[in-house]
Each structure stands twice: as structure tokens, then as C-alpha cells.
Amino acid sequence: MARIAGVDLPRRKHVAYALPYLFGIGRTLALQICEKTNIPQNKRVEELSDAEVKAIRDLLDAEYKVEGDLRREVQLNIKRLMDLGCYRGLRHRRGLPANGQRTHTNARTRKGPRKGMLQRRPAATK
């Protein structure tokens, strides 16, 4: 099993479909990596030689940020926005959408489950 950037790639998949299992690599970038390392896209991960795995690993280390480094950079960017106190930072701090989406009826993913209305108790009768 090929282990790249701390992630085990699925053995039975083609290289072009296995590389997107790494955070920060999508389908297009996976195809570019295959092209740069001269590895056929339809070759399966289990068929890769140690030299080919090393070539992919070296290319990722040299040219791209993936996994932990990329996650850290994204978190630092969000933290910087919050420290600046700009509008986007405030939206992140409040857990609301930051890119202008409506929140009156939607944005349930960011806002969490509905709070529900409080039920009034009927007045006591004498």
C-alpha cells in the first residue's frame, strides 16, 4: 500500500482516482501529477513501484502543500481574519456564512439545528 503524506492510498484504484484522497489534491491536480511524474493515469496504486511512489512523494514535497501543512495554512488564514476584526472574520467567529449567502431561511449547516419556538403555558384558571 502506498503511503503518501501520511495517508494510505486505496490499493485497487487507479492513481488518478487515488491521489484525491489527499487533502488539497483534486482530480485535475492528480492528472497533472501523473503527467509530471510520467505515470500512466490508469495504473493501479498496487502496481506502482517504490521509485514511482518516491517520485510522487518528492513532487508533492517540492511543489504543493497538502494535508497538515495546507490545513494549518487555512486555519491560520481564518484566524488572521478573525484577529483583524473584518466582516469575514466576524462571520467566522459567529459561525455564519462568510460570503454573502442569505441566512433568513437557509444556512442550516453553519447555524446548526433549529432552536424552535418556546411554547407558552396556558394561563391557570381559578
Swiss-Prot record:
Name assigned to this protein: Small ribosomal subunit protein uS13
Natural source organism: Sorangium cellulosum (strain So ce56)
Stated family: Belongs to the universal ribosomal protein uS13 family.
Ranges of compositional bias, category Basic residues: 105-118
Region Disordered: start-end pairs: 92-126
Swiss-Prot/TrEMBL keywords: Ribonucleoprotein, Ribosomal protein, RNA-binding, rRNA-binding, tRNA-binding
Functional note: Located at the top of the head of the 30S subunit, it contacts several helices of the 16S rRNA. In the 70S ribosome it contacts the 23S rRNA (bridge B1a) and protein L5 of the 50S subunit (bridge B1b), connecting the 2 subunits; these bridges are implicated in subunit movement. Contacts the tRNAs in the A and P-sites.
Complex and partners: Part of the 30S ribosomal subunit. Forms a loose heterodimer with protein S19. Forms two bridges to the 50S subunit in the 70S ribosome.
rRNA-binding as UniProt keyword: yes
A Pfam short name: Ribosomal_S13
Phylogenetic lineage: Bacteria, Pseudomonadati, Myxococcota, Polyangia, Polyangiales
Chloroplast is among the record's keywords: no
A molecular function (GO) term: tRNA binding
GO cellular component, one term: cytosol
GO biological process, alphabetically ordered: translation
